[in-house]
Design a protein with these regions (language model features):
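Amide-forming acyltransferase catalytic core, primarily the GNAT-like/NAT-type
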Residues: 1-66
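Active-site/acyl-donor-binding loops of N-acyltransferases
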Residues: 27, 45, 52-152
Length: 152
């Protein structure tokens, strides 16, 4: 669970959905009928966890569904996703929100392509007083990947 607080601290400007160890176990290890591959990127000498990835193989590609870790280890995670996909002779694809797409491209500028999708993310907010203001503070700041949906 050390990676989740590190991730929250390194992206303070974003709203992040829950990515604790218990959530990952529920989301990726306890879902019947779907095989996910969970990778843990470690520091070579100490074995300290740097980042974790959730991947899913398809016949023509490898989906990178989730990332857990601080921003500074994103380049290591990208390299791990590419190495895993290469072993299975597939390209890597990832859905990421616009808020973090530039972070992924900056972490590994060679060979990454970013293109907008037409996916709309409906959000709303309620508190004890009822609906909040029409301008939501998280607009443009949601840290999302494909694994944050129920259909991947």
């Amino acid at each position: 669970d050390a990676l989740w607080p590190q991730m929250q601290a390194s992206w303070p400007q974003h709203f992040l959905p829950l990515r604790s160890a218990s959530h990952w176990a529920w989301r990726y290890q306890q879902r019947p009928g779907v095989d996910y591959h969970l990778l843990l990127v470690r520091q070579r000498l100490t074995g300290k966890p740097l980042a974790a990835l959730a991947l899913r193989l398809h016949p023509g590609h490898c989906d990178w569904l989730d990332y857990l870790g601080p921003s500074q280890h994103l380049p290591h995670a990208i390299a791990a996703a590419r190495a895993f996909a290469h072993q299975h002779q597939r390209p890597v694809q990832a859905l990421v929100s616009d808020a973090v797409a530039s972070d992924f491209c900056a972490a590994q500028p060679q060979g990454l392509h970013s293109s907008p999708s037409d996916i709309s993310i409906p959000t709303n907010a309620m508190d004890a007083a009822g609906p909040t203001a029409s301008v939501a503070p998280w607009q443009g700041h949601l840290w999302l990947m494909g694994g944050d949906s129920d259909f991947m």
